[in-house]
């Protein structure tokens, strides 16, 4: 594997840690055509960011995500920030020709999602939205039943996903 892909991550809290671990472990699970390189970690608190970078193996840190996206040596921008920040970051990354790995939910509303999609489609880049529950057995079964027409025409869908960590009233509700 000779090709290397330089990654910049924006966000070093919970999802940033989860994504960093994923990038580090990917080669242990998949045959990759390129090696992910943990190049730059972006965040607001430089003291925390330095600890994060040291812990997960990021080469550099920055508190200026826009300038990092604009760098020529960055191939992929991993957006692991709260949802209300995704719109501006995705559009900026697409505008600068970066491939995008974005945490869910993608956008706050349909209008934001459509403008983000338009930016990605006009940029010759790939946007990957992290749908990590798509392999859950219940989701796979529901998709199969819909695809096979077993549920008829679907006009509306409302679902919930029961997380056991929500059963603990002392569990923190923030995901950052």
Regions found by a protein language model. Give the residues of each.
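Core-facing hydrophobic residues within beta-strands of well-ordered domains
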Residues: 36-38, 74, 154
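Hydrophobic residues in well-ordered beta-strands that form the structural core
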Residues: 102, 127-129
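Predominantly a Rossmann-like dinucleotide-binding segment in NAD(P)-dependent oxidoreductases
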Residues: 125, 133-176
């Amino acid at each position: 594997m000779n090709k290397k892909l330089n990654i910049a991550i924006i966000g070093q809290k919970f999802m940033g840690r989860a994504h960093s671990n994923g990038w580090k472990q990917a080669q242990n699970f998949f045959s990759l055509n390129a090696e992910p390189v943990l190049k730059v970690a972006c965040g607001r608190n430089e003291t925390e960011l330095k600890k994060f970078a040291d812990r997960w193996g990021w080469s550099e840190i920055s508190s200026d995500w826009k300038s990092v996206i604009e760098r020529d040596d960055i191939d992929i921008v991993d957006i692991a920030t709260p949802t209300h920040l995704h719109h501006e970051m995705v559009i900026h990354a697409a505008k600068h020709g970066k491939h995008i790995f974005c945490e869910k939910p993608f956008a706050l509303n349909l209008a934001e999602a459509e403008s983000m999609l338009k930016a990605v489609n006009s940029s010759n880049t790939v946007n990957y939205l992290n749908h990590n529950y798509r392999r859950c057995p219940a989701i796979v079964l529901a998709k199969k039943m819909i695809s096979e027409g077993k549920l008829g025409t679907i006009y509306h869908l409302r679902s919930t996903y029961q997380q056991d960590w929500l059963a603990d009233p002392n569990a923190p509700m923030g995901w950052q």
